[in-house]
Regions:
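Terminal targeting segments of Actinobacterial cell-envelope proteins
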Residues: 1-49
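Conserved, single-site charged/polar hotspot
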Residues: 50-53, 91
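Hydrophobic membrane-insertion alpha-helices, especially the h-region
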Residues: 52-70
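Zymogen propeptides
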Residues: 65-79, 83-256
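Short, solvent-exposed loop/turn segments at the edges of secondary structure
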Residues: 189, 260, 327, 405-409
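Aspartyl protease catalytic domain
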Residues: 197-198, 205-346, 350-359, 363
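C-terminal soluble interaction/assembly domains
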Residues: 341-343, 348-382, 386-398
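Low-complexity, Gly/Ser/Thr/Pro-rich intrinsically disordered linker/tail segments
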Residues: 387-427
């Protein structure tokens, strides 16, 4: 065997070297080296493992936090689509998420920003618009708004012509709708306009699940089941409370304190509707059924507010997705007879929105919600199997059943009127 001395060879110092033993020395040294390297190899492997753990640990922590945070966020009750809800999670919960979302949206919207010119429309969209069933008597026709004067020299069929929606009330149309192209430079842009006869309608204001944040009575967060038999239309609310301290009230109870100087849409207990420049302090008076504020007035006494501007990141007129000046915008106005007008149009600045409201007859007006997700006007027909909702103006991000199920944001419901003082029915 290698590494063992054979007997009878004498002292190792005088013995001649055995050829068979000479390789045994490096072999023995090799074993010793191998035995000496084993602890070092384990230590190296441990060091590599520690480095990997140190590198991976932050990612594991962040991933674990993200999974928990996202799950908690997505499991909260909401009416938003999962993709929109996911975007809001990034914006609100992820560090620098607001910048990331804004930057991404800016790129997307810049690529799809409206361009001037282009081909003319051959017809106007008819989404949500029902043709008139019968000709109205001349006296009733005179009570409605005049045809919207077309902007284009060659108007399309039905452009600016008011059409009734839903069943008549007291022999006349409670709700009228029309469409028209508001700007020569943007021939494919369409404005959707709805007019509500204040003598044939009654309007209620409803808190949503999260807006206003401190609702005195949260209510059903949708059109109450017991009121749907008289439902005519629903539409979106204004800017959130955090975007301008926009207060609101229902049935004499303050949700969020009203702010002096804000434009305020008010429904009085006698059934009349008004837009006022609020100066009454944080609470409403006993004659007010409901109130909803949204920024400053954009039209006053028939004239545009001189402080209007096209800044897409204006703290006064609302931040837009992607920092674009032209986005979906909505607004409400009051005409000379005290009737309510609602407008929704894509590719609008706050100035062009005000001009649309001015053109359709508003003498006072205010901006409501903006950006693609929130504009919502829905009219209803009472069919044999219940309500048939129809979107007026396209919005693929919202279903026609919005407001028939609990919604995150506040909204308005338009009803056939009931006798007596107006209150907001929560049942």
């Amino acid at each position: 065997m290698r590494g063992l001395r054979r007997p009878g060879t004498g002292s190792g110092a005088n013995a001649p070297p055995d050829p068979d033993e000479s390789p045994g020395v490096p072999a023995s040294l090799g074993q010793g080296a191998a035995q000496g390297e084993q602890p070092g190899g384990l230590a190296a492997r441990r060091r590599r493992l520690r480095r990997r753990i140190v590198i991976a640990a932050p990612f594991v922590v962040v991933l674990s936090w993200g999974i928990v945070s996202y799950s908690v966020w997505m499991l909260q009750p909401t009416s938003m689509r999962w993709d929109a809800r996911s975007t809001e999670w990034v914006r609100n919960e992820v560090p620098f998420g607001n910048w990331v979302v804004d930057h991404g949206e800016s790129i997307d919207y810049s690529l799809n920003a409206p361009k001037t010119g282009g081909p003319q429309l051959k017809s106007l969209p008819t989404v949500g618009l029902n043709p008139p069933r019968t000709s109205l008597p001349r006296s009733q026709a005179a009570a409605g708004p005049p045809r919207v004067t077309p902007v284009f020299p060659h108007p399309l069929a039905g452009e600016g012509v008011w059409k009734p929606v839903g069943p008549p009330v007291d022999g006349g149309p409670p709700v009228l709708v029309t469409t028209f192209r508001p700007e020569l430079a943007y021939p494919q842009t369409v404005a959707y306009v709805t007019w509500f006869d204040h003598t044939r309608t009654e309007i209620g204001y409803y808190p949503g699940r999260y807006e206003p944040p401190a609702a005195a009575v949260r209510g059903p967060m949708m059109v109450p089941y017991d009121q749907r038999s008289r439902l005519l239309a629903t539409f979106n609310g204004g800017f959130t409370y955090t975007d301008g301290a926009n207060g609101s009230a229902d049935n004499g109870r303050t949700n969020e304190p009203l702010k002096d100087g804000n434009a305020t849409l008010i429904g009085y207990r006698d059934g009349s509707i008004a837009i006022v420049n609020w100066s009454g302090g944080p609470d409403v008076g006993p004659d007010v059924a409901w109130a909803r504020q949204s920024l400053a007035p954009i039209i006053w006494n028939g004239q545009l507010n001189p402080q209007l501007d096209d800044n897409p990141n204006s703290p006064q007129w609302g931040y837009t997705l992607g920092g674009l000046a032209r986005v979906w915008r909505t607004g409400v106005g009051i005409d000379r007879r005290g009737n309510l007008i609602y407008v929704a149009a894509d590719d609008q600045t706050v100035i062009t929105l005000a001009k649309i409201l001015q053109r359709v007859g508003a003498v006072r007006a205010m901006e409501f919600d903006i950006n693609p997700e929130w504009h919502t006007l829905i009219t209803y027909i009472h069919g044999a199997n219940g309500l048939v909702p129809t979107m007026v103006g396209p919005n693929p991000l919202q279903p026609p059943t919005r407001y028939l199920v609990p919604d995150d944001r506040d909204f308005f419901a338009v009803y056939r009127p009931l006798p007596g003082p107006v209150t907001v029915p929560f049942k």
